[in-house]
Structure formats: C-alpha cells, structure tokens
C-alpha cells in the first residue's frame, strides 16, 4: 500500500461531520434499505447488509433507524436507487472519485457538476480517474483497545487472510482483497479485537499534494460533494496531511 494511511484523516472528517449527523443517518438508511432489499433482511445471511449496519453503528446511528430501514425493505417499498459514480479533478490536479445512490439521476448529476465547477474542479468522463484507485477492504483497530503488539496483530491479520498491515501510534490499519473482507473482519473479531472501522473503500495508487493556495478550494469541493443528499462516498488522491 506504499505507506498510504487513512485513519488520521478519517477521524478528522468524522469530527467535522458531527453537525451533519442527520444527513449521514439519511444516507446510511438508504444504503441499509438497498442492501436489505437486494440481499434479504437477515444480516447473518447478507454480508453487504451486515457491513452497512456495522458502518451505521460506528456512526452512532440509533437502532430504531436501522430497524426502520430494514422494515421498509421488507414491506415491499417501491423506492429504488441507482448506484452512479462520478470522476474528476479537484484544484491542484487531485483525482476525485464519487459514489452516489440516487432516485433522480439528473438532480444528482447537476449537484455534482455544480460542486466541481464552483470550487475550481473539473468533472471528467467515466474512467478518467477510476483506474487510479483500487477497491480494498479496510479495517482499523484502535491501539488503545488491545494489548497485542505489532507482531501479534500482523500474525493474526495474515492468518485471517489480510493483505497488508500499517501501524501508527494510534492504530493498526488492515487492507484486504474486497472478496476476503468479510472473512478477515469476522476472523479478527473472533480473535478478540474491537474494530474501530470496517468498510469497503477506494485507495489511491498514488497521492498528490494539495498546493497551499488550493487547499481551501479543495476542502470546499469535498464538503460540497458530501453535502449532496445523494452522494454516499467521496474518495480523493490527496496526500495525507502531516
């Protein structure tokens, strides 16, 4: 993984999004609904649903909200959302990959286009930046929650089928093949680890530093994309901040 670390930036963005918690719950409800509708309402038999529920819990989403989304899918609701991706460049030439879940493609396309153009970015064609990212399973163990040292964690990760381990002062970050993600996650939980985060994500193969004079624009672009009700995830190839 060439030293790319996500955890510090993830924590920063989660803290910044506390004020937007209601919108986050709305987006998670949409994901839960679609996962339950396509794969069934039982998380034990639906790995995708289980993963989204875990994600919802890590964002402190109330249990009642989770149950309502599942019951809505069980009740035969006719709501349908399309999965769409958008690609482009942020100020400074930083690649951006956006995942959306929408019931109105025109509205979403307009929102994304405006976010890029108003904040110094440029929306690209399909495939323009996707090849710069790899789909990976991503798991985090907060070091304060385990007595295991790096050697022990590495051994357990390899035994579980993980691909890579990165260690920082705060966390163990584990990367997996997407197809092995659920098995690795379950094995680590069985080994007694408490997971701070576990999700499928997009990891840039290479990163680009954001120029100092473009940083504010870059942050505004990401915020504008995340503010869209239809945008589920925003991935960038920005270099990690020190």
Curated annotation (Swiss-Prot):
UniProt GO molecular function: DNA binding
Main location: cytoplasm
A Gene Ontology term for the protein's cellular component: cytosol
Top-rank taxon: Bacteria
Localization per Swiss-Prot or TrEMBL: Cytoplasm
UniProt keyword terms in alphabetical order: Cytoplasm, DNA-binding, Transcription, Transcription regulation
Pfam families: TACO1_YebC_N, Transcrip_reg
GO BP: regulation of DNA-templated transcription
Keyword Hydrolase: no
Region Disordered: start-end pairs: 1-22
Cross-referenced PANTHER family: TRANSCRIPTIONAL REGULATORY PROTEIN YEBC-RELATED, TRANSLATIONAL ACTIVATOR OF CYTOCHROME C OXIDASE 1
Family per similarity comment: Belongs to the TACO1 family.
Protein name as catalogued: Probable transcriptional regulatory protein lhv_0777
Taxonomic source organism: Lactobacillus helveticus (strain DPC 4571)
Lineage: Bacteria, Bacillati, Bacillota, Bacilli, Lactobacillales
């Amino acid at each position: 993984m060439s030293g790319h670390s996500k955890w510090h930036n993830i924590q920063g963005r989660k803290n910044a999004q506390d004020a937007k918690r209601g919108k986050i719950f709305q987006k998670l409800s949409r994901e839960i609904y679609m996962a339950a509708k396509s794969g069934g309402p039982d998380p034990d038999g639906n790995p995708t649903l289980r993963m989204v529920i875990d994600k919802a819990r890590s964002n402190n989403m109330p249990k009642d909200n989770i149950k309502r989304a599942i019951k809505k899918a069980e009740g035969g609701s006719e709501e349908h959302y399309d999965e769409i991706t958008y690609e482009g460049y942020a100020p400074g030439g930083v690649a951006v990959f956006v995942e959306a879940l929408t019931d109105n493609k025109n509205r979403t396309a307009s929102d994304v286009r405006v976010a890029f153009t108003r904040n110094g970015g440029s929306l690209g064609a399909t495939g323009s930046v996707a090849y710069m990212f790899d789909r990976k399973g991503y798991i985090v163990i907060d070091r304060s929650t385990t007595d295991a040292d790096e050697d022990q964690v590495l051994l357990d990760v390899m035994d579980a089928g993980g691909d890579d381990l990165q260690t920082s002062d705060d966390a163990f970050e584990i990367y997996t093949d997407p197809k092995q993600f659920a098995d690795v996650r379950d094995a680590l939980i069985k080994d007694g680890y408490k997971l701070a985060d576990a999700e499928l994500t997009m990891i840039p193969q290479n990163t680009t530093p954001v120029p100092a004079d473009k940083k504010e624009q870059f942050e505004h672009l990401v915020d504008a994309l995340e503010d869209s009700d239809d945008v589920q995830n925003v991935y960038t190839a920005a270099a990690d901040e020190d």
